Amino acid sequence: MNTQQLAKLRSIVPEMRRVRHIHFVGIGGAGMGGIAEVLANEGYQISGSDLAPNPVTQQLTSLGATIFFNHRPENVRDASVVVVSSAISSDNPEIVAAHEARIPVIRRAEMLAELMRFRHGIAIAGTHGKTTTTAMVSSIYAEAGLDPTFVNGGLVKAAGVHARLGHSRYLIAEADESDASFLHLQPMVAIVTNIEADHMDTYHGDFENLKQTFINFLHNLPFYGRAVMCVDDPVIRELLPRVGRQTTTYGFSEDADVRVEDYQQIGPQGHFTLLRQGMPDLHVTLNAPGRHNALNAAAAVAVATEEGIDDDAILRALESFQGTGRRFDFLGEFPLEPVNGKAGTAMLVDDYGHHPTEVDATIKAARAGWPDKNLVMLFQPHRYTRTRDLYDDFANVLTQVDALLMLDVYPAGEAPIPGADSRSLCRTIRNRGKIDPILVSDPAQVATMLAPVLTGNDLILVQGAGNVGKIARYLSEIKLKPQIQEEEQHG
């Protein structure tokens, strides 16, 4: 580390000048990789380990990071600190070695908190919409020339990265409630998009515990900070009297401080008016579909307005918004003649949503923008516990499509739970009599099983949080055409 880099570090996190080498266990994850990228650009020596290369590790390697595709004790040698993701177990050999060598082991959010400590932090929390809202806030601040640092859980498509080091005082970050680690953060501004029952194992199955944790997160704001909250959400409306900080509400509700009105969707764009108390109305064109994205934009506008950002910069950023990876991500439109001999085309969209509320929002956006399309979904349930806990909600939501193909549950390290598998879910949906789901037991056969349900005027939603995104890219590469011998290069 040279003198110039050390000087930069002292100006950002003064006491972290004592740290030289930071090692990340599970560095290929989007959240971990984003923080590693910011720290690499700040001049720290970065190393990390994961099981396989991916775009995140490739980006970090290009920045000079050392990446190990294994988990071995010697990987943490000479590290000043070891950062671990919540997905890593305590018996990981690198964590064990770090403890034996008395190297501090911290969670991702603790490192993010250190980055935020000496900056104007804006943290975006909530069950749904965090990633997109983080990208919208970042885009507005960048358009206004404020050069923010951002750390996001998904790819910010305009920047081509999950995270970027800016040179201003602003740090915009997604705040993760899945393991309650967002309690480490002490931002100046916090957005809460909504609160629903998810990741309930963390909260011992107690929804009141989850709600109190969000309140505790907001109490990390200084008394002069601000909470920006969606008043359309019934849980947030219930919790507002307990926040104890300055608040700005947003939503379609008439009593919202920033109110969405006259929403219309035309194709992939939303058009609406934002009414702000004591400020001119904003007539917004948002380059993202769905009423849920209008709410995300309202949150971003509330924060930007509070900061005094020019309205023209806000409107430009939203109209040119390029979205985030795997959030209603348009992968192409393909002719069906080579696929199944039919005239016409099929659009292919990839989406990360894996909670019934998210899936429902994606379906509604697709129906609103393309009402005449045959809506086909390839769905991969994520985690047996989530499938069990939200089983009826999934069954209700998934009956809204015209054709449904379902992959096996992506376990994310969980053991199977009887009755919470894809076969059972398909049977339940079939018994409701609206659609006849197709169970896809072999991912290599997706294109072959998809072809017969396509009509020539289709919108295909590839939906889920597991490895189904790889399948979406594979379908795009082969232009939906079944292969004679489909290789599992996607799974």
Swiss-Prot record:
Pathway: Cell wall biogenesis; peptidoglycan biosynthesis. Gene3D superfamilies: Mur ligase, C-terminal domain (3.90.190.20), Mur-like, catalytic domain (3.40.1190.10), NAD(P)-binding Rossmann-like Domain (3.40.50.720). GO terms for cellular component: cytoplasm. It is an enzyme of class 6 (ligase). It catalyses: UDP-N-acetyl-alpha-D-muramate + L-alanine + ATP = UDP-N-acetyl-alpha-D-muramoyl-L-alanine + ADP + phosphate + H(+). It comes from the Bacteria. GO terms for molecular function: ATP binding; UDP-N-acetylmuramate-L-alanine ligase activity. ATP binds at residues 126-132. GO terms for biological process: cell division; cell wall organization; peptidoglycan biosynthetic process; regulation of cell shape. It is found in: Cytoplasm. Its EC number is 6.3.2.8. Keywords: ATP-binding, Cell cycle, Cell division, Cell shape, Cell wall biogenesis/degradation, Cytoplasm, Ligase, Nucleotide-binding, Peptidoglycan synthesis. Its main location: cytoplasm. Cell wall formation. Belongs to the MurCDEF family. This is UDP-N-acetylmuramate--L-alanine ligase. It comes from Salmonella paratyphi A (strain AKU_12601).
